[in-house]
Amino acid sequence: MALAVSGLHHVTIRVQDPDRARAFYEETLGLPFIEIPVDQAFVREWKGNPSEGTLLATQIGSTFLILAPPLEGTPDDDRFSERRIGVDHLAFGVDDPAVLEEVTAALEEASVPTAGIETDPVLGKPYVAFRDPDNVQWEFFLAS
């Protein structure tokens, strides 16, 4: 059965320190976030998260990126690892190669480690990879 999926609606990432994560995404990548209070009914019941605070949301194309505080019981020093089953990395698609240069410059200015613009060995497309403050690997990938 083929599903009529129109795209990826949202990605939610649990972050250790929402303020630190927000600063990284807003100041380094220029992604503006809005705050969604956790005490709203639909959020209170969401995934059984009893914590107070806010969810942070931004829209990238037609996809929403949501940053959520850690669930109760998450170790204070927990960080993302692609060596566990689950997500390996996430990639933003861009249509203009100049965006890759802009992202690389912004990452370097913010002292975020990156190998610069590389070429994907399978697709032959340029991309730039980096890690956020919670160690999640992100890529900006030339989609066209």
Segments from the language model and where they lie:
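Core segments of cupin and vicinal oxygen chelate
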Residues: 14-64
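Generic short beta-strand segments
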Residues: 37-39, 70-72, 109
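A generic structural micro-feature
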Residues: 3, 48-52, 81-84
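A short, acidic/glycine-rich surface segment
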Residues: 41-45, 72-78, 116
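Acetyl-CoA-dependent GNAT
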Residues: 68-75, 143-144
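Vicinal oxygen chelate
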Residues: 2-4, 8-16, 56-59, 78-144
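Short, charged/polar, Gly/Pro-enriched secondary-structure boundary elements
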Residues: 65, 75-76, 134-137
